[in-house]
Amino acid sequence: MNVSHASVHPVEDPPAAATEVENPPRVRMDDMEGMPGTLLGLALRFFQFLFAAAALCVMASTSDFPSVTAFCYLVAATGLQSLWSLALAMVDVYAIMVKRSLQNRRLVSLFAIGDGVTSTLTFAAACASAGITVLIDNDLNSCAQNHCVQFETSTALAFISWFAALPSFLFNFWSLASR
């Protein structure tokens, strides 16, 4: 049998050209930390859910929040934010458990649009609630008749939820734009 084996006749790699050494091929990092399906992405989703649910519970625990439209808007926005974050946290847990990448173009588009919408709604609701809270506390001086501490706490928690949602949106949007 005349079969040639690599161990018998070793073949050397040709030397690299000068252009390949100067310009190495671009490597794309598909699973950067903070993206969907990573541990940091899961942590961001968890904190989004935690702070949005806390803002929702604190605001809903007051008896007079339905009388102000901005506070109703905050309850609706944080409710949507908490549901969205919880659903995507479950998707992240699944992806981490089965070691699956969530870098599908359609999924990233859905995540980017959903994160953009929910974070914008949460930010707008927190800003509106902050304006009403300042009006009640500073301008009208009627905190004795209202639940100002709960309003301020809920507004602060909504802002913190938005701060946790913003990196998720930026990572997804960056991943979508870099394709």
Curated annotation (Swiss-Prot):
UniProt entry keywords in alphabetical sequence: Cell membrane, Membrane, Transmembrane, Transmembrane helix
Location of region: Disordered: 1-24
Mode of membrane association: Multi-pass membrane protein
InterPro entries assigned to the protein according to its UniProt record, in alphabetical order: CASP_dom, CASPL-5
A Pfam cross-reference name: CASP_dom
Membrane-crossing segments per the record: 39-59, 71-91, 116-136, 156-176
Any single Gene Ontology cellular-component annotation: plasma membrane
Superkingdom of origin: Eukaryota
Cytoplasmic-facing ranges: 1-38, 92-115, 177-179
Protein localization: Cell membrane
Extracellular side: 60-70, 137-155
Main location group: membrane
Entry's family note: Belongs to the Casparian strip membrane proteins (CASP) family.
PANTHER family: CASP-LIKE PROTEIN 5A2, CASP-LIKE PROTEIN 5B3
Subunit structure: Homodimer and heterodimers.
Name of the protein in question: CASP-like protein 5A2
